[in-house]
């Protein structure tokens, strides 16, 4: 077995299982080190016992490399594959089978843990036809939000990758902060160049309900906004975080009127919106995007978690934009932009 493939697969499965970042990083670092060695060097180092003298290779990763080069599936990988056979959820499989893409993922250009190429390649490998790269906007400095200049650089990187990846498409996008007044945290000219714009609240989450409603309605009514991300901002694990307060019926009605999709965020610590609000968004006639908000390749597998919640709450599959082809998705967003 190729040792790089073994190390990367272990990292993917650890991410899927919500392992600590430091554990995942050890395997991705080791994969990069081994991938950079000259032909035959890894075999030589296994033979003479010098593998662990390489920076970035420890006892655990050295063992995986040795087993892989010996022609075996590493024991640690076998164990993780066995654990991954258990489904993440008890439902959601029917909708998950219809999905073609994911509108919300991050790279190490902002607060993600992996390069753009790794995220795109992982999306391909799990069967997606397309995925949208949505790194953060400038104001979210804690997440290394992209300045206009860095976003322009990223567009060029994505264009280069797409030349090599066809027919898979990595679509350009952003997770754009909704500012206090409901305006969007990026230059309009740049937003017009993007394929998909996810808009999210990341600040003043405890704003007065009336003000938060005005803020969100203004944002989702903007023709440059395509998806409303994690609408309540809640966190349901760890120390947790309460939901932002707003008039959900008014916000979802505005989404339906503007053709802006409500995100069903699949991250286990978010599960946003809550079921009671998700059902109200269905009643409002809104579109939906079942997204992972992935910050690492293995987290792309979490989409079934959102699919289960969508099925439980009666979300019609035809109103889920992540079931659409890339062409249909882009027609939708371009038609929205034409009203700008």
Where are these regions (language model features)?
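Core AdoMet radical
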Residues: 132-133, 174-176
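Charged catalytic cores and adjacent phosphate/nucleic-acid-binding surfaces used
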Residues: 74, 79-98, 116-121, 127, ...
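Long, highly charged, low-complexity intrinsically disordered interaction regions
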Residues: 1-93
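Short, flexible N-terminal segments of the mature chain
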Residues: 33-34, 124-126
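Ser/Thr-glycine-rich phosphate-binding loops at phosphate-binding pockets of nucleotides
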Residues: 103-109, 130-134
């Amino acid at each position: 077995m190729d040792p790089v493939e073994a190390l990367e697969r272990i990292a993917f499965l650890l991410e899927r299982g919500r392992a600590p970042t430091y554990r995942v990083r050890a395997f991705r670092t080791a994969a990069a080190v081994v991938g950079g060695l000259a032909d035959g060097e890894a075999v030589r180092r296994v033979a003479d016992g010098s593998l662990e003298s390489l920076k970035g290779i420890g006892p655990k990763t050295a063992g995986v490399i040795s087993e892989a080069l010996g022609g075996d599936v590493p024991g640690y990988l076998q164990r993780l594959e066995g654990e991954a056979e258990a489904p993440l959820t008890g439902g959601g499989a029917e909708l998950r089978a219809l999905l073609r893409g994911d509108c919300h993922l991050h790279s190490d250009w902002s607060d993600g843990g992996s390069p753009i190429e790794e995220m795109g390649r992982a999306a391909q490998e799990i069967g997606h036809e397309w995925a949208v790269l949505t790194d953060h906007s400038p104001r979210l400095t804690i997440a290394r939000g992209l300045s206009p200049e860095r976003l322009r650089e990223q567009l060029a990187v994505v264009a280069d990758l797409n030349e090599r990846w066809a027919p898979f498409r990595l679509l350009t996008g952003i997770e754009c902060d909704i500012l206090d007044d409901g305006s969007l945290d990026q230059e309009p000219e740049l937003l017009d160049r993007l394929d998909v714009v996810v808009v999210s609240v990341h600040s003043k989450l405890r704003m007065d309900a009336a003000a938060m409603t005005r803020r969100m309605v203004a944002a989702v009514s903007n023709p440059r906004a395509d998806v409303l991300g994690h609408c309540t901002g809640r966190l349901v694990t760890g120390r947790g975080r309460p939901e932002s307060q707003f008039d959900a019926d008014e916000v979802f009605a505005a989404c339906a009127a503007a053709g802006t999709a409500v995100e069903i965020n699949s991250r286990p610590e978010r599960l946003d919106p809550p079921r009671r609000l998700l059902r109200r968004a269905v009643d409002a006639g809104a579109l939906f995007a079942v997204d992972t908000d992935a910050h690492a390749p293995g987290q792309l597998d979490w989409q079934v978690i959102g699919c289960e919640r969508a099925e439980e709450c009666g979300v019609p599959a035809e109103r889920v934009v992540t079931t659409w082809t890339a062409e249909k998705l882009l027609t939708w967003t371009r038609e929205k932009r034409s009203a700008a």
